[in-house]
Amino acid sequence: MVSGKYTYTDKQYIGSYLVDSKRMLTPTFLFNLMQEAAVNHADKLGAGWDYLRQFGHFWAMSRMDVEILRMPRWQETIVINTWPKGHNFLIQPRDHQIESEDGEILVRATTNWVILDLEGKPVQLSEYEEPLTRCEPELHAIKSPASRLRNAVPLENPIFKPVVYSNLDVNHHANNGAYVTWIMDSFDDAFHQSHDLSFLAINYLQQTHADDQYTIMKKETAEGDFLCSIYSQKNSVEVCRVRTVWKGRR
């Protein structure tokens, strides 16, 4: 069990609506559960959504690395731990560790968060210095910072799909989990039945909105290792870059 003055812990029962046909928590719901814990913790630390909104600001995730040791299963109860690790000029790193009730480490993750104004421009974190000092700089789920994915997959012969209602968040942007869903859906069922996700890195580059369309370009760089670029139809700009690593099922 992770413990510290500024850590946050939540428990979650894995119901049938959270799992796939393999009876395992889906990557999208894994992502959403960690994000919800981060949102709730930020609120408890005094720098949550409502507090920032009164100044015309909001939190946005910019990067995330997730190591999946074992995906939580249907009817399992998991313990979700999260904590901020400090901040610099524009970025607050935050870690997550998910465990079974018996203390088995299932998932480790590290993230970068920024504060944006309503025009999508970064805000200096010094504006919120006092609540952001409530952190655990020496506590790490993953010690290295979230990955910067440097290479894009070129846009070629795109087939665009619309951003739909279920993709939108409280800021009327495509929510972070929607990008994970889009990537997971780019692999067919046969692939999912024969592989399990073991690592995901995601870089958010720009926001996507309700009136937009997107497409995914994907390249296998090594066996089971895929790089994906998500492009917006508007000006053909890359909005998200994702790396997934998969292991074959026994």
Where are these regions (language model features)?
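Hot-dog-fold acyl-thioester-processing enzymes
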Residues: 1-61, 108-110, 116-198
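Short structured motifs
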Residues: 62-68, 80, 199-204
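HotDog/MaoC-like acyl-thioester-processing domains
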Residues: 5-9, 67-151, 208-210, 219-250
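Acidic/His-leaning functional-site neighborhoods
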Residues: 155, 159-244, 249-250
